[in-house]
Swiss-Prot record:
The gene is TIAM2. This is Rho guanine nucleotide exchange factor TIAM2. The PH 1 domain and amino acids 621-782 (a region called TSS; otherwise known as CC-Ex) are necessary for membrane localization. The PH 1 and TSS domains are necessary for Rac1 activity. The PH 2 domain is engaged in the enhancement of the catalytic activity of the adjacent DH domain. The PH 1, TSS and DH domains are necessary to induce neurite-like structure. It comes from Homo sapiens. Interacts with MAP1A, MAP1B, PARP1 and YWHAE. Interacts with CD44, PARD3 and MAPK8IP2. Residues 397-413, 1596-1607 have a biased composition (Basic and acidic residues). Expressed in the occipital, frontal and temporal lobes, cerebellum, putamen and testis. The modification Phosphothreonine is found at T1648. The modification Phosphoserine is found at S1583. Phosphorylated on serine and threonine residues. Phosphorylated on Thr-1648 by Rho-kinase. Its phosphorylation by Rho-kinase inhibits its guanine nucleotide exchange activity, its interaction with MAP1A, MAP1B, PARP1 and YWHAE and reduces its ability to promote neurite growth. The keyword Cytoplasm applies. Modulates the activity of RHO-like proteins and connects extracellular signals to cytoskeletal activities. Acts as a GDP-dissociation stimulator protein that stimulates the GDP-GTP exchange activity of RHO-like GTPases and activates them. Mediates extracellular laminin signals to activate Rac1, contributing to neurite growth. Involved in lamellipodial formation and advancement of the growth cone of embryonic hippocampal neurons. Promotes migration of neurons in the cerebral cortex.
Length: 1701
């Protein structure tokens, strides 16, 4: 009927019933919905009978994108609902049957009497054949017949069509067929009969004659002159749709007279019979038409002979059964090939017609309304072309698996089949004897699929929707010979394979494009950026609305040598140019209705614009087809107008709701209103998005500018902006994806795409489909499509007459290990265990003896994972499904003398007679006998002591388990975790069960157990297929050991298949190489570093060895960093000195320190000669003390890393320069020619950050493996605390830098003078920070002066004072942009001040009349050169202790600066560059186990004595790991092994030259004391500190390099008891040790100090033949000019016994 706007399109109803003599005539009523007053109607819907009622396949899979792969019949139940269906198209071209003419006739249904044009066609003398059944013809005969079989006199009148409206408001009508020759004979009573409402049920009441439909076989007397002219409205192109139409009218093969119809076989050749319906015989000849003695039992037999054309009409009959069932209204449908139908024309009586009705929503009769008849008929006469029709050899591509009828768009079926030899080929015929529905059929011939005439009619989409919406009442019987809707029977990838093999749609655009996914929809409809994917180049063709990606170039789709790599469905897409892309030009972004966003890069700007136009035009064409419109432009304009109205309405409603919300106080009502407002916001966003999309489509069709996206983005609601802000992309494309992610229909499509991917690769998006034929490894193992079809023939038939619901079903091939397999249909409700059971039953196997695993191809590796039995199969991601036999193995458990139980528990499943059916291992003790023999949780016991489990009852089982020895036969159940079993193993069997000589060695057996333990554990979920379990639980505990290695080896021999054992060995090798670099997170129970069956000694040994090995690797990496990058960069000019500082900073010191630390660790291990043979943890005691002592000794030194870590932000900035600086980039490329990421500068610079945070993890491992009551456990715990404090200190430094780094950089940049004294402030040089009150604030601060608090930062080079306004509303400066600018309102730092150390003084200041001991003064000295007056800051700490700490720290840097000026006048930066941090010491004495003193210190020291407290000024030299005098003493010296002349460490101890300073510095010498608690003592007359001060003044500084000490020295004041009187104590370096002395350790009396002075004088007067200048050593190593200055350092001397211990 050609209603281009109607929701149903009639292509011509078919006669589906047999002629029965004397049948009562029932008028045919066709009820057609959706006819509106202003809609234009097209004749195209009235197809001629050859294939007028062809159904589309229920093609939800392979052929779903091509409408006409196969047409199958449908017969439905009564009273079903009507579903909206897209318009079907058929072209009504008619023939005459005048004597002497070659035309068979023209349907009177389309005669000029009824207002229709008729078109005659002159055909050549050849057979136009059809090899594709349209599925809607009831002339079930498959032979060609000569034209002579129909005498000229047998022509008859065509039926007359009467159109009657059914209901005034319904818009529906009824079409009644009557004898076309006598319109006046239409019985009046027929018009009043109730309309029979069926779902396309060709009904035949008893004694009813079928109706001859508008078929090519219907004879008529119409003349060829009735053909329309080429300018007929039927042949016009649609108005205004030239851009969106895929081909105009002159492309179509149904053009002027003399051309063939686009659908081959639409017209019969002169030598062909009239394939009129067999129901069309006059009553007079009713006894002959079907030769009722039919011998055929089903129509399938008609197609078994390829030469059916030779049969006589009398030899072809419908079975009596068929006729009977039709007579009883059993709703059968059958069909035959279009052309293999003999004419059944007879003379005489008028033809009677049956009544047909279309489905409607209200199954009741409607009162006729004839008022609209004329207007409807007039509308039906209007014939116009359809926008987007395809050329004759093309076929439209349709989105697959769309579930809504309205989503299926239609296009004309084109393509002429000129294969003359194909006339005898018939489609694989589907016949059902008692079905209400027939599944789709498809041609066996591949060529037939591609080029057969394919039609559709108004029922197609309706029936498809019925298929999808049906829930029960499915009682179809399907022939085993059918392919059973092969379009659904293949996996999704195979569907796409076939689809793109057969697809011949119009290519709108093709070209090279770079492609990269950007955004996709993850779980819970959340948009996420795609994991970093590289740009890839493809040859992209736009076919219809699908982008096909090829890896090679072809001139057109027919020339493509390979199948497309993937396909991207671009339905309802928006394409936007991305000029702001930072790296590439000509980039555009495509977002589709699935919520996916993709980036493309075109070759030029013109190419980009062409792609945008092409995609938008294709989407517009598809949009028009889905809405059944022929005028795309008008449709889009109407849609735009409607959307504007909707936006206006919803905006008003939303405003009203907001007003209402402002006055409503009830919480429930407010919640409801808020939800409604949110819904309106989302609706508005969707409307705005659709409006923008329509305008984009209009712009592409009209050649205009694309709309401005500002108005669209302005419509985004606050939640949407927040979501896009989290995503990091605010653009039209991301907004479109967000809106689409909320759409339920798009989500359903996406879910279908995701769940029906079958063996798709992981990571391919729902709308981006990969194809099976590409990059498929092991393709020879995959069944071909034809093999899958054959399997479907075998296994695809439904059981018990109930069909599968193929709409959501995936046909998947399941592999078995014998290289065979089966195809099973996976439904959404199928779990893993269901698929396993189904596959095993198809192979007659016992499912309980098999497991299911998924094979995935990741890069070049094959990964296996075993899903849990209860998980849904369609939710898995895999390439192949494999069923593998579970491993059966025997275990003999025997209790020895000390073992009282086996160490496992069982769960039994029993029947009602208390007989066992199954026994499972429910628990296994990790260190029990059963575990050692290979029993694992979840294994199933098959036999007990040779007795089958099924033959036992509970009592017998308990009796057997109570015996001393029990023999078990077990099945190893697969794990329920989806952990990857292995990667990239070979298929060769390295270990075979019958090759005992190839068993892995015992240590590999243990390692295999470790891995098997990880993935052989099961939870109760494994037994989800055991619903009712009565438990006979036997739980026991044991302390047995693994002493039966032979049994274990036997178990390993049979425990895993060869492939898995190979993989496990390889996996272990990988894990060994990786070591402990990452904590294991996937293990359950909680992670431990090694498997439980290893002894504690083995685990300790492994962790210690790993600590040393990784330390070696780390030191090697740092060395490579210096050799590859640091040293060569110093000779280059493209990095400034500041940038070099940022990049490398304290790395030289760090490297030297790490070398020393590594040597310390190695010394500790080498001291334990039996390290590899220790058997118990207690034997590791000495070694663990050594390791713990090393960490304690160097804990503060690790704070070197704080500066480096804080500077890592700068590192990123410097490395960014490589993108713009070609010279820098060339340098980096030259350093890393192999392009390995591990060798890049960025990779090397991150290693220190990773390493320093790794130490606490390793120490935690050691702590967990020691006895909690042991001394080494306490010792390691203290070391762990120390390293955790280091980590927290590093984090604190980073936080300070983030908060105040802006200020530090600004102050450095704002320094006055030609040469800046402070070029950089590194966080590694931050010694202390504290908050103080400012007692004399500047007047310029105004109101802020009251109670003003400053933060004091003490660096090695300067002191900084900062006042930060505590206002949360003010934003601080971003740390990544730090320009020098004046203080503004946005700047929270209202005051900042930098005092270089050269202009710094500090003094204690108590204002007169105050008793506050917490006040002190910081002085910025005046400078005449810079014209700077003296500035005094009066500061007050919170308590005297805080004051003491900060003043100590400032004094220490002043001493450091003084020494530097005295020695060489070198600036600090130069000395820092030349200084290498630690002396290469041997093992610290504190780490020596036998030292009674160190043990005593360890036992008596509290935890906070191991490391200095950060906030109290104890981190004086964090850049060098040392602590200056007065903050941290050196409690643990090291035995001096050898001196390294390069190792210097200035600035550690009090400078004796301080005595020469002004009195105001000396008088406060209590501050300089080494006592940590000296700050508690005030300056009093006669105090011990005063005595020390006097002695300092008397000390002489020895600068004579020729004075050498003798070997015989006086013992130091702290010499040990066992030291000989004349023996020189060993000089050790102890200033790194964080273990503090006791508070009274340096409170000397006057006699002690005098003795020290005498001893110092004796040192200076030693003979000159000594080889060591002790003073020079002290000066070089400890930055002190005389030994006298360190007489109070008790730990500098120790007994020889300590050194040897």
């Amino acid at each position: 009927m050609g209603n281009s706007d109607s929701q149903y399109t009639l292509q011509g109803s078919k006669n589906h019933s047999n002629t029965i003599t004397g049948a009562k005539q029932i008028p045919c009523s066709l009820k057609i919905r959706g006819i509106h007053a202003k809609e234009e109607k097209s004749l195209h819907g009235w197809g001629h009978g050859s294939n007028g009622a062809g159904y589309k396949s229920r093609s939800l899979a392979r052929s779903c994108l091509s409408h006409f792969k196969s047409n199958q019949p449908y017969a439905s139940r009564l009273g079903g609902p009507t579903c909206k269906v897209s318009r079907g198209v058929a072209y009504s071209t008619h023939r005459t049957n005048a004597p002497g003419k070659d035309f068979q006739g023209i349907s009177a249904a389309f005669s000029t009497e009824n207002g229709f044009h008729s078109v005659g066609h002159e055909l050549a003398d050849n057979h136009i054949t059809s090899r594709d059944c349209n599925g809607h013809l009831l002339n079930c005969y498959g032979r060609n017949e000569s034209i002579a079989s129909t005498p000229p006199g047998e022509d008859r009148k065509s039926p007359r069509v009467l159109i009657k409206t059914l209901g005034k408001l319904d818009g529906c009508l009824r079409v009644e067929f009557h004898n076309g020759g006598n319109p006046s004979k239409v019985p009046a009573e027929d018009c009043s009969e109730p309309v029979q409402l069926l779902r396309y049920s060709p009904t035949l009441a008893s004694e009813t004659s079928p109706v001859p439909e508008a078929r090519r076989g219907s004879s008529a007397d119409s003349l060829p002159s009735h053909r329309p002219s080429p300018t007929d409205s039927r042949l016009r192109s649609s108005k205004g749709s030239s851009l969106s139409s895929e081909s105009s009218w002159y492309d179509s093969p149904w053009g002027n007279a003399g051309e063939l119809s686009e659908a081959e076989g639409s017209f019969l050749a002169p030598g062909m019979p009239d394939p009129s319906l067999h129901a069309s015989f006059p009553p007079g000849d009713a006894k002959k038409p079907f030769n009722q003695s039919s011998s055929l039992s089903s129509l399938r037999e008609l197609y078994k002979d390829a030469n059916l054309g030779s049969l006589s009409p009398s030899g072809i009959r419908l079975s009596d059964e068929y006729m009977g069932t039709h007579a009883s209204l059993s709703n059968r449908v059958s069909f035959a090939s279009d052309i293999d139908v003999p004419s059944r024309v007879a003379h005489g009586d008028p033809i009677q017609y049956s009544s047909f009705t279309l489905p409607c929503r209200k199954p009741k009769a409607f009162v006729e309304d004839t008022a609209k008849k004329d207007s409807l008929k007039a509308r039906m006469r209007r014939i116009s072309d359809w926008t987007g029709s395809l050329s004759r050899k093309k076929r439209k591509l349709q989105e697959p698996r769309s579930k809504e009828g309205s989503d299926y768009f239609d296009s004309r079926s084109d393509g002429l089949n000129t294969d003359v030899q194909g006339s005898s080929q018939a489609s694989a015929f589907l016949w059902s004897g008692g079905s209400t529905q027939i599944l789709s059929q498809r041609s066996e011939s591949t060529h037939a699929i591609g080029s057969d005439p394919l039609r559709q009619n108004i029922y197609e989409n309706f029936m498809r929707e019925l298929e999808m919406s049906r829930t029960n009442t499915e009682n179809i019987e399907t022939s085993t010979e059918t392919a059973e809707s092969s379009s659904e029977s293949l996996s999704s990838l195979e569907q796409l394979d076939l689809l793109f093999e057969k697809e011949q749609g119009v290519v709108r655009k093709a070209g090279w494009l770079f492609f990269k996914p950007l955004v996709t929809v993850q779980k819970e409809r959340k948009l996420e950026l795609v994991a970093r994917r590289k740009w890839k180049q493809y040859w992209v063709t736009l076919k219809g609305c699908t982008l096909l990606f090829y890896e090679t170039y072809g001139k057109n789709s027919m020339d493509q040598s390979s199948a497309p790599r993937c396909a991207l469905f671009a339905e309802d897409s928006i394409v936007q140019s991305v000029p702001e892309h930072p790296k590439k030009e000509n980039v555009f972004c495509l977002s589709n209705s699935f919520g996916d966003v993709y980036l493309f890069q075109a070759t030029s700007q013109t190419d980009l614009e062409n792609w945008v136009t092409a995609v938008h035009s294709a989407c517009a064409s598809l949009f028009a087809k889905k809405h059944g419109k022929e005028d795309t432009l008008r449709l889009l304009k109407n849609q735009t107008k409607n959307l504007l109205q909707k936006i206006d309405m919803d905006s008003k409603m939303k405003k009203m709701a907001e007003l209402q919300l402002s006055v409503v106080s009830d919480p429930k009502n407010r919640k409801a209103i808020e939800n409604q407002i949110q819904q309106w916001e989302q609706n508005l966003e969707k409307f705005h998005m659709d409006l923008f999309r329509m305008r984009c489509y209009l712009a592409s069709l009209q050649g205009g500018e694309l709309p401005n996206p500002k108005s669209l983005l302005a419509a985004a609601s606050r939640p949407s902006k927040l979501a896009l802000g989290r995503l990091g992309i605010l653009s039209v494309s991301s907004f479109h994806a967000l809106v689409c992610s909320r759409d339920d229909s798009a989500l359903r499509k996406r879910t279908l795409s995701l769940t029906q991917r079958g063996r798709n690769k992981k990571g391919i998006f729902s709308s981006l489909k990969g194809l099976d034929t590409l990059a498929r490894k092991g393709k020879e193992k995959r069944p071909s499509i034809t093999q899958v079809d054959e399997l479907l023939h075998i296994y695809g038939s439904t059981v018990d007459g109930v069909p599968r619901d193929n709409a959501w079903e995936i046909q998947t091939y399941v592999h078995f290990q014998d290289n065979h397999g089966v195809t099973v249909g996976i439904k959404p409700e199928h779990r893993v265990e269901d698929i396993l059971t189904l596959a095993c039953k198809m192979r007659q196997l016992e499912p309980s003896h098999y497991g299911l695993q998924l094979r995935k191809l990741v890069d070049d590796n094959v990964e296996y994972c075993i899903p849990a039995p209860y998980e849904y199969m369609q939710q898995q991601v895999y390439d192949e499904i494999e069923v593998f036999p579970l491993n059966v193995y025997d275990v003999q458990l025997t209790k020895t003398g000390s073992v009282c139980d086996f160490g496992f528990a069982v769960t039994a499943q029993v029947d009602e007679r208390q007989h066992l059916s199954r026994i499972f291992i429910s628990d296994v003790l990790p260190d029990g006998l059963a575990y050692g023999e290979g029993l694992r949780k979840g294994n199933e016991i098959m036999t007990l002591n040779g007795e089958a489990v099924s033959d036992l009852d509970l009592k017998q089982m308990e009796a057997l388990f109570s015996e001393k020895s029990v023999g078990l036969t077990l099945i190893a159940r697969p794990p329920d975790t989806k952990a990857t079993l292995c990667t990239s193993w070979s298929d060769s069997d390295l270990f075979s069960r019958d090759q005992k000589s190839l068993l892995p060695p015992p240590n590999q057996s243990q390692l295999l157990e470790e891995f098997l333990d990880n993935f052989k554990k099961n939870t109760a979920n494994d037994f989800s297929n055991v619903p009712d379990i009565t438990t006979g639980l036997k739980r026991s505990q044991t302390d047995g050991t693994l002493d039966q290695v032979s049994h274990r080896e036997k178990m390993e021999q049979t425990f895993r298949s060869a492939e898995q054992i190979t993989a496990l060995c390889r996996s272990f090798n990988d894990s060994q190489a990786n070591g402990m670099e990452g904590p294991r997170e996937n293990q359950d129970p909680p992670p431990r570093s090694l498997a439980r069956h290893l002894s504690d000694a083995d685990r300790l040994r492994k962790v210690i060895q790993e600590l040393v090995d990784t330390e070696k690797s780390y030191v090697k990496d740092l060395s490579c960093l210096f050799e590859l990058y640091l040293e060569p960069l110093q000779n280059e000019t493209f990095l400034t000195q500041d940038e070099m500082e940022s990049l490398f900073g304290s790395l030289p010191e760090m490297l030297e320190f790490q070398k020393v630390f590594l040597e310390t660790l190695e010394d500790g291990i080498s001291a334990s000669s039996d390290f590899n043979t220790l058997e118990t943890p207690s034997q590791f005691r000495k070694l663990l003390f050594s390791l713990g002592g090393s960490f304690l000794y160097y804990a503060d030194h690790f704070k070197l890393y704080s500066g480096f870590c804080a500077n890592h932000i700068k590192v990123q900035k410097v490395l960014e320069r490589a993108k713009t600086d070609k010279a820098f980039k060339a340098f980096l490329d030259a350093r890393n020619p192999t392009k390995q990421h591990s060798s890049t500068l960025e990779s090397y610079l991150i290693k220190p950050v990773q390493r320093v945070l790794k130490y606490p993890l390793l120490l935690k491992e050691l702590v967990s493996l020691t006895d909690q009551e042991s001394e080494e456990h306490y010792h390691l715990t203290e070391a762990l605390k120390a390293m955790e404090k280091v980590a927290s200190h590093i984090n604190e430094m980073q936080k300070i830098y983030e908060d105040y780094g802006t200020v530090f950089d600004q102050l450095v940049a704002e320094q006055s003078g030609t040469e800046k004294e402070v070029t950089e402030l590194s966080m590694g040089e931050l010694l202390m920070h504290s908050t103080v009150s400012w007692l004399n604030p500047f007047l310029s601060l105004g109101k802020a002066r009251k109670d003003l608090e400053l933060t004091v930062f003490v660096f090695k080079r300067a002191v900084i004072l900062v006042y930060k306004e505590n206002c949360k509303l003010k934003k601080k400066l971003p740390s990544n942009s730090r320009p020098a600018h004046n203080s503004t309102d946005l700047d929270p730092f209202k005051f900042r001040w930098l005092i270089p150390i050269s202009a710094l003084q500090v003094r204690l200041g108590n204002p007169a009349g105050t008793e506050n001991n917490s006040i002190w003064e910081l002085i910025h000295t005046k400078s005449e050169i810079e014209g700077r007056p003296e500035t005094i800051f009066q500061l007050c700490c919170s308590d005297s202790e805080s004051k003491t700490n900060i003043v100590k720290v400032i004094r220490s840097i002043l001493r450091e600066n003084f020494r530097r000026h005295i020695k060489c006048e070198l600036p600090l930066e130069k000395t820092c560059k030349d200084r290498l941090v630690p002396l290469k010491n041997r093992v610290p004495v504190s780490a020596k186990l036998a030292s009674s003193r160190s043990l005593k210190v360890l036992k008596n020291s509290s935890s906070n004595e191991w490391t200095g407290e950060t906030g109290k000024g104890t981190l004086l030299d964090s850049d060098e790991g040392s602590l200056s005098s007065g903050t941290q003493s050196s409690g643990c010296p090291t035995a001096e092994g050898r001196q390294d002349s390069k190792s210097t460490s200035p600035g550690k101890y009090p400078h004796p030259g301080l005595a020469d300073f002004a009195d105001n510095l000396i008088k406060e010498s209590d501050i300089l004391s080494d006592e940590d608690d000296d700050h508690r003592q005030t300056v009093k007359q006669g105090s011990p500190t005063k005595d020390i001060e006097i002695q300092f003044q008397r000390l002489r500084i020895s600068e004579d390099p020729d004075v050498h000490p003798e070997a015989e020295q006086q013992p130091g004041p702290e010499s040990g008891e066992g030291q000989k009187g004349g023996e020189q104590p060993k000089l050790v370096r102890g200033h790194f040790c964080p273990i503090k002395r006791k508070a009274n350790s340096t409170k000397r009396d006057r006699g002690t100090l005098l003795k020290a002075q005498i001893r110092h004088q004796s040192l200076d007067s030693q003979s000159e033949n000594a080889t060591i200048d002790l003073n020079s050593v002290l000066e070089r190593e400890f930055s002190v000019q005389s030994l006298t200055s360190v007489v109070s350092e008790e730990c500098f001397y120790e007994t020889e016994s300590h050194g040897k211990s």
